């Protein structure tokens, strides 16, 4: 085929620097729209790879952790990049979550720089175990196992300081029935996991009240 020049205008309603994939939403929307315009010549996996290039332009690194689920839907596992391998995981019917934004901005670069260059072997082992548990939880559709496995020892301890009252909020929502709480992306948004809709709504209210003071 021949090169085609296309201009895309995107109405972005996800705040940049929120930790919930604003750049990925733009990249995914652009490649999805162009694919539709051209008659859908590309597969979902190919669209993810194209959208990764948009992420690289905006963030410096081509990665699929946000554009993957944005284009394929649900929960995905990025097994590797060379070669690129992405796998959709089944999602339990009783998988609900609440997301809250504290109304502050944390740059992705700042959040990345907060991470240590090296971690203890014990932390690496714990993280690998939780990653395995998380994947197994989705494969088994076991929301309780998913919740137990959402324990991050690599990023959360170093990024939670950017989020006002993070530890107190986490203690509160876990006591209130959440199965887990963690930082969305690089922050400052946070999310909590629940096993039913009513609990997710209640937890959402708790997080909203916390950040509104």
Question: What function would you assign to each model-found segment?
Answer:
Residues 1-58, 174-175:
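Anion-binding (especially nucleotide phosphate/pyrophosphate-binding) glycine-rich loop
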Residues 23, 66, 185:
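Conserved acidic catalytic centers in enzymes
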Residues 25-27, 39, 79-80, 191-193:
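Residues at secondary-structure transition points
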Residues 43-179, 193-212:
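ATP-dependent small-molecule kinase catalytic core of the GHMP/sugar-kinase superfamily
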Residues 180-184:
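Short beta-strand
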Residues 188:
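Conserved glycine-rich beta-strand-loop-beta hairpin in the small C-terminal domain of fold type I
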């Amino acid at each position: 085929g021949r090169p085609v020049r296309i201009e895309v205008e995107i109405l972005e309603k996800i705040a940049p620097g929120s930790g919930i994939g604003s750049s990925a939403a733009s990249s995914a929307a652009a490649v999805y729209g162009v694919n539709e315009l051209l008659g859908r010549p590309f597969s979902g996996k190919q669209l993810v790879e194209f959208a990764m290039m948009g992420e690289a332009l905006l963030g410096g690194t081509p990665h699929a952790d946000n554009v993957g689920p944005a284009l394929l839907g649900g929960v995905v596992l990025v097994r590797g990049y060379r070669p690129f391998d992405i796998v959709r995981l089944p999602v339990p019917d009783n998988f609900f979550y609440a997301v809250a934004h504290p109304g502050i901005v944390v740059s992705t670069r700042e959040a990345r720089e907060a991470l240590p260059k090296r971690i203890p072997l014990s932390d690496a082992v714990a993280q690998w175990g939780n990653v395995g548990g998380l994947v197994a939880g989705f494969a088994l559709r076991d929301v309780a196992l998913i919740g137990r496995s959402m324990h991050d020892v690599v990023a959360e301890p170093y990024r939670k300081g950017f989020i006002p009252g993070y530890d107190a909020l986490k203690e509160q929502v876990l006591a209130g029935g959440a199965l887990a709480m963690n930082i969305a992306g690089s922050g400052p948004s946070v999310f909590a996991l629940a096993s039913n809709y009513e609990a997710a709504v209640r937890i959402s209210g708790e997080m909203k009240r916390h950040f509104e003071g």
